[in-house]
Structures are given as structure tokens and as C-alpha cells.
Amino acid sequence: MSSDNKYYKILLMENPFFNKRYDTPHEVPPFDKIKFEHYEPAMMEGMRLESEAIEALCNNPEEPTFENTIMPKTGEMLENVTSVFFNLLSACNSPEMEELSQKMAPLLSEHSNRITMNERLFLRIKYVWEKRHELDTEQQILMEKIYDGFLRTGANLPKEKKEELSELRTKLSQLSLQFSQNELHDTNAWTMHLTAEEDLAGLPESAVAAARQEAETRGMEGWVITLQAPSYGPFMQYSQRRDLREKVYRAMNSICTHDNENNNFENVRQLVNLRQQLAQIMGHKTYADFVLERRMAKDVEHVTDLMDKLLEAYLPVAEKEVAEIEQLAREKEGEDFMLQPWDFSHYGYLLKMQRYNIDSEMLRPYLQLEKVQDGVFGLATRLYGISFERATDIPVYHPDVVAYRVKDANGSFLAVLFADFHPRANKQSGAWMTTYREQWVEDKTGENVRPIVSIVMNFTKPTKERPALLTLGEVETFLHEFGHALHAIFSQVRYEALSCTNVYWDFVELPSQFMENYATEAEFLNTFARHYQTGDPMPQELIQRIRESRNFQCGYACCRQVSFCLLDMAYYTLSTPLAQDIRTFENQAWEKAMVLKTLDDSCMSVRFGHIMSGGYSAGYYSYKWAEVLDADAFSVFQQEGIFNTDTAARFRKEILSRGCSEHPMTLYKNFRGEEPGIDALLRRNGIGK
């Protein structure tokens, strides 16, 4: 045996990714055995094996069929290693992983391009597609998705155009990664070190304790404020130090604008222009045209129409809300007081207190993370009959992470769920749901392969003095990501490409935003909201004030979201290269939805990961689209009972379990009986009749 073969065998034995199946409960990735040095060899070998499998498939002398062309899983090893690597790149990062991601991104992109540009493979797929009438409904949908996917990656293009497209996609992959890492680094690079008690004026104890703990973690005295949401949000809302609010606000709004290696201005320009080039190679005038062709919204006109309707309804409300805050600020500070962006959150909080005598700190003692988790899991149990069992035998990727077995009402296994709740220095900000494995049915054995799901948050950590206590907004975030998780957990389709959240991009937020509706329902809060010290339930009059105040600043919030949609659409409806100054372009794009002035030197685009690197390019509207859907869907529960198990069973059957096995509008109408309208959203916000 040659030394090379010996090395390969040793590598195969030691590297968990080289095993076809993991020797772990439910074949969860063996996080406790995975080492950094395993990733690159496994990715390289995974690409080699997939290329071999594709070549064998193309060389098959038999007539192309669904079974011999569409069904074979050719990239299992590569999928296994990349799902772990890129998920941990967001949740449990390291400098070595970042460096490797930069190295592997172009190689993986080129590998993907070779597959989608493979003419022999495409001809086999096309042959099966032309006989799709012989397939059943779910097979036809899968066939359409695969065939369309090849078309949209350029399989039908002339050779020189394929090469150009391949280069574009590789550049986009590299730039997207660079954009994200620049934002992460620049966000983490800024801190404000406070050493005097007077600097803390107005801050609640929870914010003071978190700032103290942040300082201790860094080996510093005093308190440290960061640009992470659990630190930034409370400081801007509660701090009475206007000078410090301004400092923090300016820092947040200048992320990635500085003259350093994290500057993202040129990355924005290149990402927008490369996507425009890609769309035009594919025969579309703009990138938005290209994207929306395969969305529920269908085209730019439908998106624009929705935004116009929302602005018509909400802009007058938003302008009134801002005027009320300005009036309050002048009453407190004098007639000459000029409201600035760093004042809005603070005086908005004071107005809310004056009007409803409620703020997030009043609620926080009743929203202990463990109790909230019991409530959220309990909601799923009450609606769907499922249960969650903590599983200490399942490996996790960080000590903060907890694993659960999710079981159906009949006791059958549904999924593994990881819960990762707290910030870390090596973890991206924000909140998200992801999968390490999706659901499908093994064709040969009939085995129903169940998903491995993870919900990732950045909730304030517990301190020495008190447990982790959430704001109501964080409870909504929990429900949101848990809704995504249920979409994956309940998946019951035959093919992986149609399962879990592999649905139209403007449908994917329905299950998540639907769950947020429960956050202000008294019947839900009564199940878990207890004071962390006394055990007393949240008072009913406090719950009533929550419900009365839930539409506070809803006009401003809607217009702000619409402004982001307008910015997204402005970039991706360009038909010529973006040459304008980014700040100027941004201000012009969202001007008609802007009810609060922005700073001349601020810029959102350079840190707007959603539309630059996060998959929402020409798709940010989907959040508002999903709001229309979720309000309409929840109105059914309001009519029939918010815990009605028959309604929940119908929602699970027609929406949550079906993935992309039918067109989303068909699925929605199967549940609702009709297409959604905007009226339920307006009623929810106190604007409709």
C-alpha cells in the first residue's frame, strides 16, 4: 500500500465527515469530534466525490428517467461538511474559520458552477422535464424547480456567457462574504467604556448589570456599552445622557463607513452592479425582474403597489407619531429643542410611559428566559400536541447550546432542536433559524429522515445577580425564530429540495411572523409570565396595557420597514451601473417613506446585510408581504379560537408540513379558503375599520 493511500485511510478514519453516517443519536453532526483541520479535506473530498457522481450519472447509457437522473443524491458529503462549517461560521466563529471561508468560497462557487453549467447533465434533466406529465404532482414540482434552477444559473446560455456568469457568481460569493465579515468586525471593534456613575443616568438595572458584565469579560473596570442589540437598544431608549446617546448613535450609523479595511462602500457598489450584470446576462432588464419572476409577488409592480398602499395608510399615522414625540420633547426641554435621531427612541419611551405607563423594563421581571421558553414550547404543545425533551446525549457545538428531542403527539420522533440563546464574541448579531439537515423520505427504504434544526438568538446573558430576563420584543423574536423552526420540524414531503423552509422567499416568513401574534395575547402570557423573584403572575392590568400599547408607533415602524424595501428595490431596479454616491442614492431612494431625518454622514447600505449578503436582495419586501399573510392567517384563529386545535391542525397540514410541494398561494388558499388581503393587517394596527 502506498504512503498516499495510508494517509487517506487515516484521514478517513479520523475525519467525521468522511463517514457516510454519523455514529451519534439521530445522526446529529458529532460536534464534540469535529476539529478545524477536518473542514478543508472534507470539502475537497466532497467536491471530488460529487464530481465523480455527476460524471457517472452523465455517462449512464440508459434513457434519462426521474429515478436515474433526479433522485440520486450526489453531494451528501459536501452538504454535510458545508452545513456544519457555514452554520458555525455564523454561530461559533474563529479567525481560522474566516480565513478558510475566504479560501474555500471561490472553490465551492466554481464547483457549483461546473455542475449547473454541465451541458450533458442539463440535457438529461431537460429530457426528464419534457416528460414531466408522466410524473405525480410532487415529482413535477421538484422537476420544475430543478429544471428552472438550471435555467436560472445559465445552463441554456452560450459557452462564453456561461463562463462570464460563472465568474460573476464567484465574485458575488467572495464579496458577500467580505461584506458580512466587515460588518461583524466593525460592529465588534467599537465599545464605549464608562467609568462614572453619572454616565449611567436613566439606565435600568438590567442594562447596568449587562454593561458591568461586559466590562468584566474584557478585564475592565466600570461598564462597557457595545453596538450589539442587547446593549445598544436599551442605552438609546433609557439613557438620560444625550451626549452619550449621540455618541452611540453615530457609532452605530457609521459602521463600515470608516477609512479602514472594514469599509463597505465599494462592496455595495460592486454587489449591486454584479447582480445587475447577472440579471442582464440572464435576459432580464434588472435584478429585481430576475428575482421576482420566481416569487409570490411576481413582479416589481406588485411590490410597488403593496408599498404604495402601506404608505398611503401608515404615513399620516407616522407623521402624527413623530409630531407627538417632538411636542413632548419640547415640553420637557424647551421650545428651542430640536429633536435628533438619537432622541427619538428615548422620548418615544417617555411618551409611551406617559400614555400607557408601560415599558419593557416593567415586563422584564415577568419574562425570565426559562419561563418564556416553557411558554413557547408549551404553546406548540397546546396547538399541535408535540413535546420537547432535553437531550444531554446529543452533542452540541458550544456549552451554551441545549439540544432537545421533539416528539409528535403519538410519541414518534419529529426532529432535533438546538437552542443557542446568548451573545458571544465569535457569534453574529441578530437572530436566525437554520438547519443542519432537512427532512426527506429515503426512496429505497422509505425511511422518513427527520430534520436537525437550530434557533440562534442574542438574548442578554444572566448575571450573578439575576437570571436572563427578556423584553417583550425579545419574546417576539423567540416566537419568530421558533415559527421558522416549526416550519422545518413539521415538514412532511418526499424530497429534500421541497422540504422545510425551501419555499418561495416571500412565503418563508409566514410561519415565523404568524407566531409573533401570540406575544400580546393574554391567554398565552398567562401560561408562563411569572415574576422571577416572587412567582406572582403578570397582573392582568399590565397585560391590558400591553395590548393597548401594542400599536404604539406602528405607523413609524411600518414606514421604516417600507423605507428599507424602497432602498432594496431602488438598488435592484437599476438597469445601468450604480455610479452615484452611495449615501446620496440611499437618501433619494427612501425619501418618500422617511419621517425622521437621517444624519448626513450616516449610511445604512454598508451594513444592510439582508439585501447585500443575506439573501434578501430584491426581496426585503417579503417581510411586509408576510405581515399581510400572517395578519390574515391569524384572523382565522381569532375567529375560531387562538388555541383551537382543529384550526392549528389545518395550519400544520396545509402550510407548515407541505414545504414547497405546491405553489404557496395554493397552500394558503387551502388553509384560508381565499387569497389574503391587507384589511386584517390594518385592523390589527388599529387603522382599518
Predicted feature locations:
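Short, hydrophobic/amphipathic alpha-helical patches that form generic packing surfaces
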Residues: 79-87, 144, 148, 344-352, ...
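Active-site-proximal, well-structured secondary-structure segments within enzyme catalytic domains
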Residues: 138, 142-144, 171-174, 181, ...
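Short His/Asp/Glu-rich catalytic/ion-coordination signatures at enzyme active sites or charged loops
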Residues: 23-38, 86-104, 126-167, 226-266, ...
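Intrinsically disordered or highly flexible coil/loop and linker segments, enriched in small
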Residues: 48, 52, 56-63, 80-94, ...
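N-terminal helix-rich structural modules
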Residues: 7-203, 637
